[in-house]
Regions:
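An acidic-aromatic loop/edge-strand motif
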Residues: 149-152, 165, 171-175, 184-224, ...
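Mature extracytoplasmic enzyme cores
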Residues: 47-58, 64, 76-91, 95, ...
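N-terminal export signals
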Residues: 15-36
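Aromatic-lined ligand-binding clefts that engage carbohydrates, nucleic acids, or primary amines
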Residues: 910-912, 916-938, 965-969
């Protein structure tokens, strides 16, 4: 069960969460309201006044992507630190997170931990240098709470009160009537190194019940559990005779430090050990170390100038048994009203596997109650406490609140910035879990540790990165922490420099080391600007989602989605987020106009199904059932899937609780806008019957994903032709179909104008062809795999547009129509007559004169800047060569370049006829090109390329006669590393990089519609 209960300071768990959110919501409303109403409130984007400003074209530093910046602890040079901050700033990024990570360094002694460890004077000097230069450059710097991960503190020993703890068990089998005499059974697992003390918590006996046994669990009769702790002699021996019937098991329970150190340590002297994440002592050890040893007056001042967030990585507590804290028995008793010890057999773990089990339903209920108690301790004493401490320093807390069996959705609501990851998250629903917590709490940012791929060091392409992140942005992500940027060098590093995760286990690691060492760094400003514009849109205003999916168990990073919505609803345009019980007690959890959280995500319906984490059992806590009833009575449509006419409590029920739950559900199901169904295929019809439709609609299923943000001025729709997970097969294909977008803002005169926002160029233009129906707008969406389109719906004149009064096109047989200045024009690649129907009712015919045929260049000159290891790990030698190509091939297919990496500049010429005029133009289609590329025509740079659809309009750069086209392509380093470091990279197959084509220049002619 989960009823609000009093905690030590007189606040219930739910009150704790609500209190943390209230201040954030109030601050957001005050900042956003201006002269508008609460329903219209929306924070400005990066301080910009709104869509009329240039915030989209030139995104602010605050919304630009960031780097995870890996240091070899404190073995850094302050001049190099300042130089790397400049490199990050010059490339157009917004900041960095300093993290002590050096998995690639096997011999840790070379890092001189005694003098240059995490937290040492050289480390502090490096942090100060980073903050000082960041303040000058307008960047912000984040700091991990400890070295590597999980959070650990130098000087804490495994036996300390503040150290992480485990509960381990011992066992002995007895036949009926047999006597056990001797030392209490010792733990089945030996203690970790450095653990010198362990305490006997309890000894129990229980009768084996084969009917409850599973493949891994020994079944026990719960009524037979006997506490033998008081019979243990002072010398640790036990004498006990089992009853005559059945087989019996003696179970001993021991508590001790887990002895876990942060990943790939040691990082400090003295060594750091992971802290207790469930007890105030663990948090106090973290904050106390910072206060006493790190936060000098200088550092405090610099944090105010350029500090961003403290960061905690995913909570990967490792133990052979059950993660423990001494207060768990008392906390469990306060939470449930029952003692914990009789239930311990159903809870103990060995190597992450359950050891014993009672009857299945009782076991489920016990485990639910335990992990809910565990979660409350984690969120209260760790997440909230660290967040409040960060605030006291003018910082925020960003964290990945998953890895334990805790309510990560609730954690996301407490955190200033929750974060997920592209490597560890199984699919987009993992991000939607965190997005629900963020949006219900009134926060803005959902961050993502982005771009780590197993075994892909020095072969990761930005194309792959963008395809990964395209879907994540549709699922709620709006900040990217790129994984990552390695400090230049470290002892033992090989060319092209220190890389935190490579080599890894003798082969290429995960996590790219971006920076000047990478050939694509010459083009990375285009990537940074693109990501900044996407972030700017997705951090503007308020996120909207169609449906809230209720989760009885708020885990994340599981890959478990929602019935119907994940597989069927999303391909039809629906959006959803996940909520857990504590979020229903937030100040934002109100209903108005049939919407839940109307000033936030404004969910149109709540969907409830059985608990996926417990065999889809139709469970509801009575407190949650009561809140659902209140929301439904206020007008919120609710759909329940499963046997919720016969609900069960998720935890062990109190006397009469099951009856109260059934009564609440009977009242809920009796309301007119509450529907119960038994087949997940009926979800769509149930929603339609309640009058609920999505904000984005298309007639047939599609791989189109969407995210919706609402500001005072506009509805922003982020559209991506993406996939639900990296492993989805078959691959995503190109799409081309009509999409209807709902406009939720009233405009003067009732006119809704759609604008196309190009995140590659920063241009915002009125869309020329669309249909409108009562404010809803239907546009054509044609996207290649992974490609993105951003549409804004708003009033005439947004983004400086001057065409708002002009009629638009509702139908045409022209391949393209657009507004050019104040004129509506037809663009065609072929001569002929084009018929266009306008919104004014007029039908216009336009004659397109002759258009030159597409041109395929037949010969290319390729100038190569080939890169080799230099005389030092950070030194690169350059060899220049020139080739003439009659056929475009990947470098791996050109003998002279098969193992090359660097920059290739492809140059060709095309001749355009004497009749070429300003009415002509052309698109340059590059075909297959990898990795990054830039185009120059007649010495002038073309607009940035869409990396996932490398076609660029070069019309304004062309002239009659001879034209010189140059394509500069960056080639990743892996092919060179295959031969330079064969012990690490030799097993990697040659990669096909370069300009492969086919390349075409496709002329068009543009004619004004009469």
């Amino acid at each position: 069960m989960r009823e609000p209960v009093e905690q030590g300071d007189g606040m219930s768990r739910r009150a704790v969460l609500a209190a943390g959110a209230t201040a954030g919501i109030a601050a957001g409303i005050v900042a956003a309201l201006g002269s508008g109403t609460a329903a219209e409130a929306a924070p400005p984007v990066a301080g910009a006044p709104g869509p009329a400003a240039d915030w989209f074209a030139a995104p602010a530093r605050s919304v630009r992507p960031r780097f995870r910046w890996w240091w070899p602890d404190g073995l850094v040079n302050t001049d190099e630190i300042a130089r790397e901050v400049d490199q990050i700033a010059d490339a157009g990024f917004g900041g960095a997170e300093i993290a002590a990570v050096h998995h690639s360094v096997k011999d840790k002694s070379v890092l001189d931990t005694a003098h240059h460890g995490w937290g040492s004077r050289p480390w502090r000097d490096g942090v100060e240098a980073a903050l000082r230069r960041a303040a000058r450059r307008g960047l912000t710097i984040d700091l991990t709470l400890g070295p590597s991960w999980p959070v650990a503190v130098p000087g804490v020993t495994p036996d300390d009160e503040a150290a992480a703890k485990e509960l381990v068990h011992g066992r002995a089998a007895l036949n009926g009537g047999a006597t056990f005499q001797g030392p209490v059974p010792p733990p089945v697992h030996a203690p970790a190194a450095g653990v010198t003390r362990q305490r006997l918590l309890a000894v129990q006996a229980a009768r084996v019940e084969p009917a409850y046994s599973t493949r891994k669990e020994t079944g026990l009769d719960p009524s037979s559990v006997r506490d033998l702790t008081s019979t243990v002699a002072e010398d640790g021996t036990l004498t006990w005779t089992a009853p005559d019937t059945g087989e019996w098991t003696l179970i001993s329970y021991w508590t001790r430090g887990s002895g876990q150190q942060p990943e790939s340590g040691p990082h400090s002297a003295p060594a750091a050990y992971v802290v207790d994440h469930l007890d105030p002592a663990g948090t106090a050890a973290v904050t106390g170390f910072w206060e006493r040893h790190l936060l000098t007056p200088t550092l405090r001042s610099l944090l105010k100038a350029a500090g961003g967030a403290f960061f905690e990585d995913s909570v990967e507590l490792e133990t052979d048994g059950l993660t423990w804290t001494p207060s768990l028995p008392d906390a469990f008793a306060k939470h449930t009203g029952r003692p914990l010890l009789p239930y311990l057999p159903a809870l103990v773990l060995s190597d992450s596997n359950q050891v014993f089990a009672f009857e299945a339903q009782l076991t489920r209920q016990i485990r639910h109650d335990f992990w809910e108690t565990f979660s409350e301790l984690f969120n209260r004493h760790h997440v909230r406490a660290l967040r409040d401490w960060a605030h006291s320093l003018g910082m925020t807390l960003r964290a990945q609140p998953y890895g334990l069996q805790t309510d990560a959705i609730e954690s996301a609501a407490i955190l200033d910035i929750p974060e997920g990851e592209s490597l560890g998250f199984k699919n987009l629903d993992d991000f939607r879990c965190l997005a629900g917590g963020r949006d219900m709490a009134g926060h803005t940012v959902l961050s993502c540790e982005a771009g780590a791929y197993n075994g892909s060091a020095y072969s990761t392409t930005w194309d792959r990165f963008l395809r990964t992140m395209g879907g994540a942005y549709a699922a709620g992500v709006n900040q990217t922490v790129v994984h990552g940027f390695s400090y230049a060098t470290a002892p033992g590093a090989s060319w092209p420099g220190f890389a935190a995760f490579s080599p890894y286990n003798g082969g290429p690691g995960y996590g790219e080391s971006w920076g000047p060492r990478q050939p694509s760094w010459q083009h990375v400003g285009d990537i940074a600007a693109y990501l900044g514009r996407v972030h700017g849109v997705l951090q503007s205003g308020t996120a909207r989602a169609d449906v809230a999916v209720f989760r009885q168990t708020g885990y994340a990073a599981t890959g478990i989605g929602a019935s119907w919505f994940t597989a069927t609803g999303v391909p039809l345009g629906w959006t959803h987020q996940f909520l857990s019980g504590p979020l229903l007690d937030l100040p934002n959890a109100t209903v108005s106009g049939g919407r839940l959280a109307p000033n936030g995500p404004a969910y149109k319906a709540l969907f409830v199904e059985g608990d996926f984490f417990y065999s889809s059992t139709p469970t509801l806590a009575t407190a949650d059932a009561r809140r659902l009833l209140t929301l439904a009575e206020a007008g919120l449509p609710i759909v329940l899937l499963g046997a919720f006419d016969q609900p069960l409590t998720p935890g062990v029920p109190d006397d009469g609780e099951s009856d109260r739950l059934r009564e609440l559900l009977a009242r809920l199901l009796g309301l007119p806008h509450v529907t119960r169904i038994t087949d997940k295929a009926a979800v769509g019809d149930a929603l339609a019957g309640l009058g609920v439709t999505p904000d984005v609609r298309h007639a047939t299923a599609s791989t189109l994903l969407n995210a919706h943000r609402v500001t005072r001025d506009a509805d922003f729709y982020y559209l991506c032709n993406g996939k639900h997970a990296e492993t989805v097969k078959p691959p995503v294909a190109a799409i081309d179909h009509q999409v209807t977008l709902r406009h939720t803002r009233r405009t003067r005169g009732g006119t809704t104008i759609p604008y196309l926002l190009d995140p590659w160029t920063g241009e915002a233009t009125r869309i020329a062809r669309y249909t409108e129906d009562d404010g809803d707008v239907t546009v054509r969406v044609a996207l290649r795999p992974g490609q993105v389109m951003i549409v804004a719906l708003g009033r005439p004149g947004l983004f400086g547009d001057r065409n708002g009064a002009e009629p638009h096109v509702v139908d045409t047989d022209a391949s393209e129509v657009l507004f050019d200045g104040r004129s509506l024009t037809v663009r065609s690649t072929e001569a002929g007559t084009r018929t266009t129907r306008l919104s004014s009712g007029r039908t216009v015919t336009t004659t397109v004169p002759s258009v030159p045929a597409p041109i395929t260049p037949s010969r290319w000159q390729l100038d190569v800047d080939d890169r080799y290891p230099g005389s030092a790990p950070t030194r690169t030698d350059h060899v220049h060569r020139t080739l003439t190509l009659d056929t475009l091939l990947p470098w791996s297919g050109i003998p002279e370049l098969a193992d090359s990496a660097g920059i290739g500049r492809y140059r060709t010429t095309v001749d355009l006829p004497p009749g070429w005029t300003s009415a002509h133009g052309a698109h340059l289609e590059l075909g297959q090109v990898s990795d990054t590329a830039r185009v120059t025509v007649n010495g002038t740079g073309a607009p940035p390329l869409d990396r996932l659809h490398p076609v660029v309009d070069v019309g304004p750069l062309l002239r009659r006669g001879r034209n010189v086209i140059e394509v500069e392509v960056a080639i990743p380093l892996v092919n060179r590393l295959r031969v330079a470091q064969p012990a690490v990279f030799g097993a990697v197959a040659r990669q096909d990089f370069g300009l492969v084509g086919p390349v075409r220049l496709v002329p068009y002619r543009q004619v004004t519609v009469g």
